[in-house]
Amino acid sequence: FPAASHVEWEDKGGYMVADFRSAGTVMQAWFDAAGKWYMTEEDISYAELPRAVRTAYEAGDYAAWHVDDVDKLLRNGQETVYVLEVERAEQEFDLYYSEDGVLLREVPDRDGNDDHGDMLPQELSKAISDFIARKYPGARIVDAEREKGNTEVDIIFAGKALEVCFGTGDAWLWTKTGVRLSEVPDVVRRTLQSSQYGTWGIDDVDLYESPDRVWYAIEVEDPQSEREATV
């Protein structure tokens, strides 16, 4: 970053993080103690987003929300990610997109924290890398994190965002894919409609695949009491 100015350093979780300006743009770069670069966060305008990201956002569920901020995350060895901070009334969400417009995740922004340290690239074990390459050939690695002793890897495969979870010994546990209600088999929808949750609103639908079965997890909400359940 030869044009960097107004540089300020701080330690964040063992990473050395530089906040600076370059050519009038606010940026942040993450390094380890040995000087290895991991990620750069760059503030950009909505107009600077790739056309595919703008098209996906404008066709999505948050199109009517106000875009408050846009960040571009350049990461060592992993996908470039674009983060749109959107708000409506008292609600705020961070929307993560790949360069080709795949919505990777939607995260409620409850604390106003703009730190994207959770998107730092992580090294995967050979067993996990080999499994993903075999089961999802050509998949692109977006993110990986340790969660409750498991390793969760976000990938893009066949134009969709998948979350692949591995447990003890890097054994594959399940893969989750967000789907539309229209993609759910009729028998599953009929079962839901005839259950105690048949009149509840549907918030989200995920398809799970594991080594021994396939199932759907449907998040529902009672419009009267605002109670929520997953069935």
Task: For every predicted segment, state its role.
Residues 1-80, 85-231:
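Interaction-mediating elements
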